[in-house]
């Protein structure tokens, strides 16, 4: 049976390193891939079609790669149309048809967990088996990595806001991913483990997923691909402007998730994460309530700004219309067909 291996996790959690490792083990990453850039010069190992599929869909709904809203996935799935689902079905069917019966297709996409039920349904209907690998990285490291990659040109105030929002979104992403993947074979791989001893991390994960990683005893291309220097962010909260209540929740979430590394079906970890998810949802609801006046003011400011822009455009259109009328008046009556050709009536 062909397998579809979804590699996911919070953005900047090592998903590219995991997918690149799997590709070097001989598993198939659909082509073409998202091209390298200055944020990830070693490669994303992410199918371009899938990245564009999710980006086009979720960006239009305001659902971020990591989003702090507990209901963000519900927003996305409520917008799912038969046409959009049909596009994914067609792409996956073509990919699987080109692979051998025992091949593994690796789909790395850090937004897939928002619409995981769609992937479950489409993969099952294609006659394949869905398995998942979730990368784990300490929230402080994720936030520092995102700061370096995306926020270097932002003001201090905006950076502080994004730090808080990204810690919240990290926790929320883990809650959603863990809950969504409970029904399929799954593995959780800490990013430091992958870099420190990739053979041990890969052997454990592949065993949990029912995959054969091949002979790892000899020198391997992964040895040159993964280096400790890839993990450049510290796992300390020092220097980050994150409230204590969120730091405490994130640390407890991180601790509970570590249990899933050795046993992805650990019932105690599931129960703990369910409780933390509810705690987070309550905290999110409180934050929304506290910020309601600020949110309303920002919406009003945006509305006024749009109205001002529209007024400027309308004024310009009025000027252009007046100019057209002036030119038409200066040109006189339009000549009829007979006058234009000089023919007698």
Q: Which functions belong to the PLM regions below?
A:
Residues 1-88, 312-315, 319-325, 329:
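PAPS-dependent sulfotransferase catalytic core
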Residues 15, 113-117, 198:
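Short, well-ordered alpha-helical microsegments
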Residues 34-41, 134-139, 144, 182-252:
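The conserved 3'-phosphoadenosine-5'-phosphosulfate
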Residues 84-118:
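Glycine-rich phosphate-binding loop used to anchor ATP phosphates in small-molecule kinases
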Residues 95-103, 176-187:
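A structural motif corresponding to the C-terminal end of an alpha-helix
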Residues 108-112, 126-148:
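Conserved phosphate-donor/acceptor-positioning beta-strand/loop module used by diverse small-molecule
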Residues 150-169:
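Lumenal/extracellular "mature" regions of secretory-pathway glycan-modifying transferases
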Residues 207, 211-345:
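PAPS-dependent sulfotransferases, especially Golgi type II membrane carbohydrate sulfotransferases
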